[in-house]
Amino acid sequence: MQTGKVKWFNGEKGFGFIEVEGGEDVFVHFSAIQGDGFKTLEEGQEVSFEIVDGNRGPQAANVTKN
């Protein structure tokens, strides 16, 4: 599991990026967020996640809010 902070997330479009210390930003789609209800993230929020290879490069999977 990796940890990082949400750089930005657009709730209307359902995606954003997670900032990883010492690494490149990672794309995150709302479908990767674990939990019930409306799936969104707040800027600066700390999260844990796995990195998988997506269609456009690395992206976050199994995202949980810390």
From Swiss-Prot:
Domain CSD, residue spans: 4-63
Swiss-Prot/TrEMBL induction comment: Not induced by cold-shock.
SUPFAM superfamilies: Nucleic acid-binding proteins (SSF50249)
Pfam families: CSD
Disulfide partners: none
GO MF: DNA binding
Binding partners and assembly: Homodimer.
Name recorded for this polypeptide: Cold shock-like protein CspD
